[in-house]
């Protein structure tokens, strides 16, 4: 049973909670206030009293945006805070029940007021009452001011700054323009939470915070007591807290205003002080009671000049901007909030009281002035608001006594009123007047003074901050306390009355709090420069004068030393320069005195001789071992003219440098020495040994060139004769053949002789080309396994007719082992043998020519071929043998025969390339023997040489051949040769015409001259290969050099043949094309099967369709290009559509795809490059189709 009451209470609580959950508000259970402040009874009218008696309960709405300092709930759901204390006072003053409801936001509370659910809305802090015709606002219950906050350690930061700073705020209060008035370059960071904003300043992320003084001070008191500090209050924009009622609730509004009026500044201060440790400005809620005259004076004097002493902490200090700080700075800040007066500081360097001597209007107020009856005649004093005792300051020592001793030096500021009194109390002490007490602390610490008279607050601050372990203070007995107040010019009694009213409104506790705040303020630095600047300037001036005079004396002493050093340096520089200049010369130079001794030389002189022979070079020139003994044989005979004109004597001779004799061009000249009567010789030489050798070598080469020119002229004369002779014979035979008087046998003989003469002419040209190949290094040997006896026998057999015609016995014998092969180039070996055999038969008129061949073994795989060619001809003298193997040279007997004089030279070089040797033995009138020895590899396999039956040459049928040559005769000859072989031939006069014909018609072979106008054969071949043409191409050239053939093959020719082109050569190469005629043409793009199906295999109709397609596309495509360029989109699409349609009929897939892409691509400036690319693709594709159409039409004619 004992648990029933608790169960009942729990159920009631749950029911009430559920009921609150169904509403838009939470109803508080009461007001919790421990404030014992009482108000005087309100003077209410009978009507107001009757209304309150009938009302009995006032429902007041608040909302969650109220800060904890103003209103918050405890664990019992009772409200606490500054507003709660005011509501508790309202409850007691009106003797009425109050019901508090909390709404989610301000708007819902106002809606409840409008609907009559509540009687009053207690607003949050706003800058002005709401503008609503249905709502009435009372006088402000709370007034707050913007507060500037920074870190405790940086409390002396300037209160205004043009520099960039970071400033935090909450909910955009205060506005940007207000902040920028003091900090024009501020970066403003807005927070939604006050704690985060203050924490950002404490952590150093921001420099300042600006916000409401009540809320900010409450948060600092709770969480940032030791890190943040309020350094200034601003007069605007202020924030207010109102009671809001309905417009018709006139009586309620009047009652609430009477309550607000009853809240004196003292009551407000006491209520706020219960919640704030600092920043309580509640005593400013009601303005000062100023007379109209005082208000008018403030309007006329809004700005006042303040004489400020920066060296009187904690009363008065300045920051870097010169603003007044310290206790007096905070008091002036409060007076500004009370009166609107602005204070401009004027700094006094030494003694603030000296300001009283300024001219009238030079100052308006002195803060922190110590009252003195003597000075009251000059200035007005406000009522004292700080009193502090006087103290003695002395050095701290173990045996320190709190008294003054005889003979002590004691400093006292001259403006202290107890100066005369202390002199009477301590006559044995030496009293020293000072301008400033703060500056004298350091002198006491240094022992310059024994004691100092100061106020207790000033002494406490200075010792605690600067001399905690060096100084201490004690009270001066029997003297009155110092009274601090404000001083004014005697002509400003109104200002005195205004300041007195403002000071009286400040609670004494607030003055004590400000004093304690600055005494405990850390890290405040006092700039004492002005106190010591005069002494510093005096000492500095004397030091500068002393240093300057010393420097002048030093300069005077060092001037002569420097001058000597400069002269010495110039001399050393000249010597060094001359030495470097001499050593940098590539040619040797040296100096010889009048006695002939070498007194100086450069490095090239020393390096020219060997180390041992250098000693001889340094000997006097008269010494016989000196290499220059002949230089000065007449040196002393130099005339006066030589001395004046500096004539340079040169002579060329040879000297020994220790290794060899060198030829030099030596020079010398005379140099007079002005400082003495003596003279020296400056000498040198240039080595011209190489130059002399080069000139000699050039002379030799010049003679060789002259001889070569003569030999070449002789060769040209010989060659012109050798070439002219067979050409004349050919022309003579042709002339005979053109007539009709020859019989058939004579004609055959004439043709045969003309052909043989032409072959000899080709052989002559071949010899010249062989020489060029050999000398250029392009002749390549191609060794093969060869049966040497058989090769020699066949070669001899070919010369049998010539030997028989001259009745010369030609024999060929061999001791070669049977069944042996040797590895050798058969063509080169045969050429050597043929040349030597031809010469032997040429120069032998009777007798015999013998050829013997043998093989000398070296080992199993190597041997040496030895072959001799012996004739019984005219023989050669020794002089002729010396010239025999030289180019273009012929013997006297040879010049009587035809020949180029190159044969033996070619033989010599070919044998040399085969690592062999060619020698001769000859005697005039007896004969000549040539001996050849060639090292070779041998094979012991059985050699089987079978005569291969000549394979019949099979020529291809139906070849379509194109000839390109600019020479009509060459085209006619080649065309007749091909016609003779049964082929149809087409002609082109240059490469351009040939390229066009190939593009329009199919050919199986192109034979082109390499040298043609407009486009030569090489360029024609490159163009065709760039079109991926596989057409066989033969090049024809009259230039028989190998590089010409290589050039043709490199540009893509299949063959490069040399003119003249014989029928046998043509047959041989044409036989390799025998498969061409049997290969069916391949079509990459034409669909022949589709064409056959659409035309019932009618070849004529197929050709007509293809020719029509070719004709129409060649009209439409250029028209499309022109339309695109002109911007005629309609014509452009018509042309493309026709091409697309024709491609569909012939089933040309690639052309279908490209034309379709062109049709669907919109024509614009952006797409124009893409369309041009597609049109070029169509153009290239149609060119390929033209070739295939030409092939089809040609094959089906």
Swiss-Prot record:
Q: How does it sit in the membrane?
A: Multi-pass membrane protein
Q: Which reaction(s) are listed as its catalytic activity?
A: ATP + protein L-histidine = ADP + protein N-phospho-L-histidine
Q: Which GO terms describe its cellular component?
A: cytosol; outer membrane-bounded periplasmic space; plasma membrane
Q: Which NCBIfam families does the entry mention?
A: PRK09959.1
Gene, per the UniProt record: evgS
After translation, how is this protein modified?
A: Activation requires a sequential transfer of a phosphate group from a His in the primary transmitter domain, to an Asp in the receiver domain and to a His in the secondary transmitter domain.
Task: Report which superkingdom the organism of origin falls in.
Answer: Bacteria
Span of domain Histidine kinase? 718-938
What is the name attached to this protein's record?
A: Sensor protein EvgS
Record domain Response regulatory: where: 960-1074
Where 4-aspartylphosphate occurs along the chain?
1009
What is the recorded phenotype of mutating residue 701 to G?
In EvgS4; constitutively active
InterPro entries, per this entry? BvgS-like_periplasmic1, BvgS-like_periplasmic2, CheY-like_superfamily, HATPase_C_sf, His_kinase_dom, HisK_dim/P_dom, HisK_dim/P_sf, HPT_dom_sf
Q: Where in the cell is it found?
A: Cell inner membrane
Spell out the SUPFAM superfamilies in the cross-references. Answer: ATPase domain of HSP90 chaperone/DNA topoisomerase II/histidine kinase (SSF55874), CheY-like (SSF52172), Histidine-containing phosphotransfer domain, HPT domain (SSF47226), Homodimeric domain of signal transducing histidine kinase (SSF47384), Periplasmic binding protein-like II (SSF53850)
- Give the EC number(s) listed in the UniProt record: 2.7.13.3
Gene Ontology terms: biological process? response to acidic pH; response to metal ion; signal transduction
Q: Which residues carry this modification: Phosphohistidine?
A: 721, 1137
Q: Which residues form the HPt domain?
A: 1098-1197
UniProt GO MF annotations: ATP binding; phosphorelay sensor kinase activity
Transmembrane stretches, start-end: 326-346, 538-558
Regions of this protein lying in the Periplasmic compartment = 347-537
Cytoplasmic side residue ranges read 22-325, 559-1197
Q: What UniProt keywords are attached to this protein's entry?
A: ATP-binding, Cell inner membrane, Cell membrane, Kinase, Membrane, Nucleotide-binding, Phosphoprotein, Signal, Transferase, Transmembrane, Transmembrane helix, Two-component regulatory system
């Amino acid at each position: 049973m004992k648990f029933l009451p608790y169960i009942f209470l729990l159920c009631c609580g749950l029911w009430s909670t559920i009921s609150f959950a169904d509403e838009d508000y939470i109803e508080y259970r009461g007001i919790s206030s421990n404030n014992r402040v009482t108000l005087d009874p309100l003077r209410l009218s009978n009507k107001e009293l009757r209304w309150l008696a009938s009302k009995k309960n006032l429902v007041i709405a608040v909302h969650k945006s109220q800060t904890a300092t103003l209103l918050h709930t405890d664990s019992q759901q009772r409200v606490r805070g500054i507003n709660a204390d005011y509501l508790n006072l309202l409850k007691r003053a009106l003797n009425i029940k109050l019901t508090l409801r909390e709404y989610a936001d301000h708007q819902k509370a106002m809606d409840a007021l409008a609907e009559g659910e509540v009687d009053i809305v207690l607003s949050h802090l706003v800058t002005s009452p709401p503008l609503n015709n249905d709502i009435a606002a009372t006088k402000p219950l709370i007034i707050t001011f913007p507060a500037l906050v920074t870190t405790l350690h940086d409390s002396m930061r300037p209160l205004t700054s043009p520099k960039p700073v970071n400033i935090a705020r909450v909910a955009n209060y205060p506005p940007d323009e207000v902040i920028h008035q003091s900090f024009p370059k501020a970066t403003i960071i807005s927070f939604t939470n006050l704690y985060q904003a203050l924490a950002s300043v404490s952590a150093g992320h921001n420099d300042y915070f600006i916000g409401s003084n009540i809320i900010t001070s409450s948060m600092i008191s709770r969480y940032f007591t030791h890190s943040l500090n309020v350094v200034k209050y601003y007069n605007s924009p202020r924030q207010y807290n109102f009671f809001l009622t309905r417009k018709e609730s006139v009586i309620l509004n009047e009652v609430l205003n009477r309550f607000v009026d009853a809240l004196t500044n003292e009551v407000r201060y006491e209520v706020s002080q219960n919640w704030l440790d600092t920043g309580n400005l509640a005593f400013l809620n009601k303005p000062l009671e100023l007379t109209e005259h005082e208000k008018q004076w403030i309007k006329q004097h809004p700005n006042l000049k303040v004489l400020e002493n920066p060296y009187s902490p904690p009363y008065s200090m300045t920051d870097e901007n010169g603003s007044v700080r310290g206790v007096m700075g905070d008091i002036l800040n409060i007076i500004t909030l009370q009166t609107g007066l602005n204070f401009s500081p004027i700094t006094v360097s030494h003694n603030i009281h000296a300001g009283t001597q300024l001219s009238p209007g030079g100052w308006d107020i002195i803060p922190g002035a110590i009252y003195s009856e003597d000075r009251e005649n000059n200035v007005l004093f406000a009522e004292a608001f700080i009193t502090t005792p006087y103290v003695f300051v002395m050095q701290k020592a173990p045996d320190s006594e709190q008294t003054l001793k005889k003979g002590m030096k004691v400093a006292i500021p001259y403006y202290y009123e107890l100066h005369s009194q202390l002199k009477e109390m301590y006559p044995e002490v030496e009293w020293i007047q000072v301008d400033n007490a703060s500056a004298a602390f350091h002198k006491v610490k240094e022992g310059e003074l024994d004691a100092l008279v100061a106020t207790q607050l000033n002494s406490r601050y200075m010792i605690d901050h600067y001399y905690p372990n060096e100084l201490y203070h004690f009270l001066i007995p029997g003297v009155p306390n110092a009274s601090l107040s404000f001083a004014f010019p005697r002509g400003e009694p109104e200002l005195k009355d205004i300041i007195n009213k403002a000071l009286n409104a400040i609670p004494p506790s607030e003055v004590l709090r400000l004093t304690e705040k600055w005494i405990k303020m850390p890290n405040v630095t006092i700039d004492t420069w002005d106190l010591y600047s005069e002494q510093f300037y005096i000492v500095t001036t004397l030091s500068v004068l002393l240093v300057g005079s010393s420097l002048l004396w030093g300069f005077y002493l060092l001037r002569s030393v420097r001058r000597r050093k400069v002269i010495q340096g110039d001399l050393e520089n000249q010597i060094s320069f001359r030495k470097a200049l001499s050593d940098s010369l590539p040619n040797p130079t040296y100096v010889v005195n009048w006695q002939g001794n070498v007194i100086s030389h450069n490095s090239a002189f020393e390096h020219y001789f060997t180390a041992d022979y250098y000693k001889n070079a340094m000997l006097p020139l008269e010494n016989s071992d000196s290499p220059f003994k002949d230089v000065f044989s007449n040196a002393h005979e130099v005339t006066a003219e030589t001395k004046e004109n500096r004539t340079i004597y040169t002579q060329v001779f040879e000297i020994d440098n220790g290794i060899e004799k060198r030829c030099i061009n030596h020079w010398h000249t005379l140099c007079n020495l002005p400082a003495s009567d003596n003279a020296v010789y400056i000498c040198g030489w240039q080595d011209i040994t190489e130059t002399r050798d080069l000139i000699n070598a050039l002379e030799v080469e010049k003679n060789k060139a002259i001889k070569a020119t003569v030999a070449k002229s002789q060769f040209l004369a010989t060659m012109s004769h050798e070439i002219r002779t067979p050409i004349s014979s050919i022309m003579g035979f042709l002339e005979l053949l053109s007539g009709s008087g020859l019989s058939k046998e004579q004609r055959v003989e004439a043709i045969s002789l003309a052909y043989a003469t032409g072959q000899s002419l080709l052989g002559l040209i071949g010899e010249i080309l062989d020489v060029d190949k050999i000398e250029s290094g392009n002749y390549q040997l191609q060794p093969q396994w060869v049966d040497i006896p058989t090769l020699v026998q066949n070669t001899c057999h070919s010369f049998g007719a010539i030997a028989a015609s001259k009745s010369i016995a030609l024999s060929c014998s061999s001791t070669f082992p049977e069944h042996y092969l040797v590895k050798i180039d058969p063509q080169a070996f045969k050429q050597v043998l043929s040349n030597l055999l031809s010469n032997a038969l040429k120069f032998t008129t009777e007798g015999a020519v013998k050829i013997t061949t043998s093989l000398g073994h070296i080992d199993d795989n190597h041997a040496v071929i030895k072959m001799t060619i012996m004739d019984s001809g005219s023989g050669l003298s020794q002089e002729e043998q010396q010239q025999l193997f030289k180019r273009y040279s012929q013997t006297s007997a040879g010049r009587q025969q035809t020949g180029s004089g190159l044969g033996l030279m070619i033989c010599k070089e070919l044998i040399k390339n085969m690592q062999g040797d060619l020698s001769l033995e000859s005697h005039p009138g007896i004969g000549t023997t040539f001996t050849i020895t060639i090292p070779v590899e041998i094979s012991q396999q059985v050699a089987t040489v079978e005569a291969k039956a000549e394979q019949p040459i099979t020529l291809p049928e139906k070849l379509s051949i194109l000839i390109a040559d600019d020479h009509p005769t060459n085209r006619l000859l080649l065309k007749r040769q091909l016609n003779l072989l049964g082929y149809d031939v087409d002609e082109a006069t240059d490469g351009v015409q040939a390229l066009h014909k190939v593009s329009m018609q199919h050919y199986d072979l192109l034979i082109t001259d390499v040298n043609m106008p407009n486009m030569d054969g090489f360029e024609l071949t490159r163009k065709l290969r760039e079109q991926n043409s596989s057409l066989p191409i033969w090049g024809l050239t009259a230039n028989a050099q190998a590089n010409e053939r290589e050039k043709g093959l490199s540009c893509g020719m299949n063959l490069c043949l040399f003119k003249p082109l014989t029928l046998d050569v043509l047959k041989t190469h044409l036989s390799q094309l025998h498969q061409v005629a049997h290969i069916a043409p391949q079509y990459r793009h034409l669909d022949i099967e589709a064409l056959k199906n659409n035309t019932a295999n009618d070849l004529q109709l197929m050709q007509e369709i293809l020719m029509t397609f070719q004709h129409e596309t060649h009209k439409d495509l250029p028209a499309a290009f022109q339309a695109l360029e002109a911007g005629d989109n309609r014509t452009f699409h018509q042309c493309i559509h026709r091409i697309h349609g024709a491609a569909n009929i012939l089933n040309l897939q690639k052309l279908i795809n490209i034309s379709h892409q062109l049709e669907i691509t919109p024509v614009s400036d952006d797409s124009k490059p893409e369309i041009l690319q597609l049109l070029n693709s169509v153009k290239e594709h149609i060119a390929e189709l033209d070739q295939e159409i030409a092939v089809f039409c040609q094959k089906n004619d």
